[in-house]
């Protein structure tokens, strides 16, 4: 029984990204610092938008959902990586691996669709200001947000079910710092070619389709801004949209590089570096990009901070 299916009878081994050399120890604590900033930044963003009623608009409600997704994303991977590094243990249970794959894939997919919804929100606000309250009513905004979560979760379920239906009869060492389904496919001794084609189609739906919506929305936005008579209105529109476009560029650039490539072209080192970028760095940068360039968020933060000081 050389090819006996050992999928469910032992743990996987996460090789991680750091060893215990002085340089890697420094990098490990740097990642923890970035994680702390990302955790605090996204938590503050969610709380600000929840507490300040003036921020209860479609744009900020969508932004709070993006921050919530980023918060969950970093908590899916970094704590386990830190525990393994500090404890010296590299194992992860089958249930733990499945949980990481589900949440990681679901959150990435949900963010893809949510970024498209955010682009549509900016399009309606700038190109159809008189109809904005109808086109982006609380009900419609809530439905599109829920749709983003559902589509992302569906992809996560598909990946978990498909990945753990394969046989893993050889090495169980995952060349990554968390369970990612492309890394598991490399270890499988089953024929994964059909699933890789399905995975490619899912990536097209999750990445290319939302990108097409974003490009179409911002093409119309740019044309509308160019024809604006007010210089102040043009500046405000570009400031609002540039923050979102910067986040979109960082997120989709890394995602396209990571998941559109064939398995045969993958390098474990490249995958680790890219994963660190959009699972830790991007969630840290998102709240900074939106808050530093947004007077309403800054005002809400100072308002809450002022209440805290006055209550002391």
UniProtKB/Swiss-Prot annotation:
Keywords: Cell membrane, Disulfide bond, G-protein coupled receptor, Glycoprotein, Membrane, Olfaction, Receptor, Sensory transduction, Transducer, Transmembrane, Transmembrane helix. It holds the Pfam family 7tm_4. Glycans are attached at residue 5. Residues 1-25, 80-100, 159-195, 260-272 are extracellular. Signal peptide: none annotated. GO terms for molecular function: G protein-coupled receptor activity; olfactory receptor activity. Disulfide bonds join 97-189. Its main location: membrane. GO terms for cellular component: plasma membrane. This is Olfactory receptor 2M3. It comes from Homo sapiens (Human). The gene is OR2M3.
